[in-house]
């Protein structure tokens, strides 16, 4: 199960498609892709 927008994470692979893990805040943010 992937993490949605602003979900807690440690790495990009934990986030849903088109999201990336922000290294400082450790939550999933949009990676700019569609």
UniProtKB/Swiss-Prot annotation:
Gene Ontology terms, MF aspect: ion channel inhibitor activity; toxin activity
Q: Give compartment(s).
A: Secreted
One Pfam family here:
Toxin_12
Tissue specificity note = Expressed by the venom gland.
Please give an example of a GO cellular component term from this record: extracellular region
Mark the residues carrying the PTM Phenylalanine amide: 34
Instruction: Extract the SUPFAM superfamilies matched here.
Output: omega toxin-like (SSF57059)
Q: Which cysteines are joined by disulfide bonds?
A: 2-16, 9-21, 15-28
Q: Which PROSITE patterns match?
A: HWTX_1 (PS60021)
Keywords attached to this entry: Amidation, Disulfide bond, Ion channel impairing toxin, Knottin, Neurotoxin, Secreted, Toxin
What else does UniProt say about it? Negative results: does not affect TRPV2, TRPV3, TRPV4, TRPA1, TRPM8, Kv1.2/KCNA2, Kv2.1/KCNB1 and Kv4.2/KCND2 potassium channels.
Domain text: The presence of a 'disulfide through disulfide knot' structurally defines this protein as a knottin.
Q: Which family does it belong to?
A: Belongs to the neurotoxin 10 (Hwtx-1) family. 62 (Vatx) subfamily.
Q: What does this protein do?
A: Selectively activates mammalian TRPV1, or capsaicin receptor, a non-selective cation channel expressed by sensory neurons of the pain pathway. Is more potent than VaTx1 and VaTx2. Interacts with distinct regions of the channel than capsaicin, since it only acts on the extracellular face of the channel, and capsaicin binds to the cytosolic side. Also activates avian TRPV1, which is insensitive to capsaicin. In mice, elicits pain-related behaviors, such as licking and flinching of the affected limb. The paw of toxin-injected mice shows substantial edema.
* Protein name, UniProt field: Tau-theraphotoxin-Pc1c
Source taxonomy = Eukaryota, Metazoa, Ecdysozoa, Arthropoda, Chelicerata
